[in-house]
Curated annotation (Swiss-Prot):
Sorted UniProt keywords: Cell membrane, G-protein coupled receptor, Glycoprotein, Membrane, Receptor, Transducer, Transmembrane, Transmembrane helix
Protein name: Probable G-protein coupled receptor C06G4.5
Role played: Putative receptor.
Highest taxon of the lineage: Eukaryota
Cytoplasmic face of the membrane: 75-94, 154-171, 252-281, 338-436
């Protein structure tokens, strides 16, 4: 950041001094009087494409981008095909899956921008794209987690309260999704509003009399004070992580308990309790594994920022943060497998649709063959009747002129069936009647 008079330069990247007493890297700040310089040259640092850790993370992010975008588009296409073919209305489960796939698709769209930012080491797209990037990434990830909570409630209501049909109606699902979207937006509104492309001066040096050269970059980050950011992080941790996690655990625990009770009461029950239990456990654990490290690392980073030894962060922590930051993206990139590809209702509809399509094709083929057979029999009977009535005429007079240039001719006689044909005599060498 710069003013008209002075620039405070964070020289911690290129000119760090070691404090011998506590063994910590101290940040050097240099003050320049900008009135002394007529020329100020701003340069960019070299990119990070030669850093192996950055390259590995960039490749990982790109793989998540391909997996998430292709997978979510495949789920949406399958649902569209099933609904269009069967001409059925959307139920609550498919509505949840559609909205979840759309939100996760938006989250995955932010990954290429993140990769570019990692490789370059700075933000190059300006302030407005920075805010849009924050909306797609942060708002999408939080809303995705809230939708997973709503889906767990939907399954809980279907098993534990089947008599309350309103809880699983389409209108109720749409209302819940709208409420969650507003909730996520209000929760993240201060953060999204404070995101901006912030200027940071890494290094500055007087390269000639009256000339100052600065290494200046932009970073897409929040522009609020430390205490406000700490309070907001804790508040977001409680509302956007702890609350959904507790609700998901509660709903799935109640669901499994109800199914276990049902299988014990009805020994001949056909409910695949073990399969449902493993699937539910996989869904809950996947959510926990993707989001818990992210929030723990975020809280730890806030603690380090507010502690006295904040400059003692080892470089390896930065790469660990990059890896942990990829976990919520992993959640969005794989949700379509757990909630779309493995969705029993969607699979059943898809198989039923394919089966109906196959039956329609078989029925159409059989109907066509039967129609052709009837037409053949009809033609045969018609020929027989005509030939039978014309037999005496053909015997007495082998040919009969129909028009000026046409004659009716007879061929062979086999079992009283006389094949007849009309020949255009203009095609013959002479106009004499000819038996074919």
């Amino acid at each position: 950041m710069s003013t008209n008079l002075v620039d405070y330069v964070d020289d911690s990247y290129l000119n760090q001094s070691m404090n011998s007493e506590n063994g910590l890297d101290s940040v050097t700040q240099i003050m320049y009087d900008m009135k002394k310089y007529n020329i100020v040259n701003d340069v960019l640092p070299p990119p990070n494409h030669e850093d192996l850790h950055v390259v590995i993370m960039a490749v990982s992010y790109l793989l998540l981008f391909l997996l998430g975008t292709c997978g979510n588009v495949a789920v949406l296409t399958t649902i569209y095909h099933v609904i269009r073919s069967s001409r059925a209305t959307l139920d609550n489960t498919l509505i949840y899956v559609i909205v979840l796939s759309c939100v996760d698709f938006g989250v995955c769209l932010s990954l290429p921008i993140t990769v570019i930012d990692q490789i370059l080491g700075f933000w190059m797209f300006g302030k407005i794209p920075c805010k849009l990037h924050a909306v797609f990434e942060n708002f999408g990830k939080i809303l995705s987690a809230l939708i997973l909570t709503a889906m767990s409630f939907d399954r809980y209501a279907g098993v534990c309260h089947p008599q309350r049909k309103r809880l699983r109606s389409r209108n109720f699902a749409i209302t819940i999704l709208l409420v969650l979207a507003v909730y996520a937006f209000i929760t993240l509104c201060p953060l999204l509003w404070s995101f901006t492309a912030r200027e940071i001066i890494l290094y500055a040096k007087e390269t000639a009399p009256g000339m100052l050269t600065r290494m200046k970059i932009e970073k897409c980050t929040v522009d609020i004070d430390s205490q406000m950011f700490t309070a907001f992080t804790i508040y977001q941790f409680i509302l956007c992580y702890c609350t959904p996690l507790v609700l998901i655990a509660f709903f799935y625990t109640k669901l499994l308990s109800k199914l276990r009770e049902h299988t014990r009461t009805f020994k001949s029950s056909q409910i695949p309790f073990l399969h449902i239990s493993l699937y539910t456990l996989a869904v809950a654990c996947f959510y926990f594994l993707c989001w818990t490290p992210f929030w723990m690392a975020t809280l730890f980073a806030v603690y380090l920022e507010n502690s006295a030894n904040s400059s003692s962060v080892p470089p390896v922590f930065v790469y660990i943060m990059y890896f942990i930051h990829a976990l919520p993206f992993t959640n969005s990139a794989i949700n379509w497998i757990l909630y779309g590809a493995l969705n029993g209702q969607l699979q059943q509809r898809y198989r039923s649709n394919r089966s109906n399509s196959t039956k329609k094709t078989t029925t159409t083929t059989a109907s066509t063959a039967l129609l052709e057979k009837k037409i053949t029999n009809l033609n045969t009977n018609s020929n027989y009747q005509v030939n039978g009535s014309m037999n005496s005429i053909a015997t007495a007079a082998p040919t009969k002129t129909i028009g000026n240039n046409e004659v009716l001719v007879a061929t062979s006689t086999i079992d009283d069936d006389v094949a007849t044909d009309v020949v255009d005599v203009r095609l013959l060498s002479n106009h004499n009647p000819t038996f074919l």
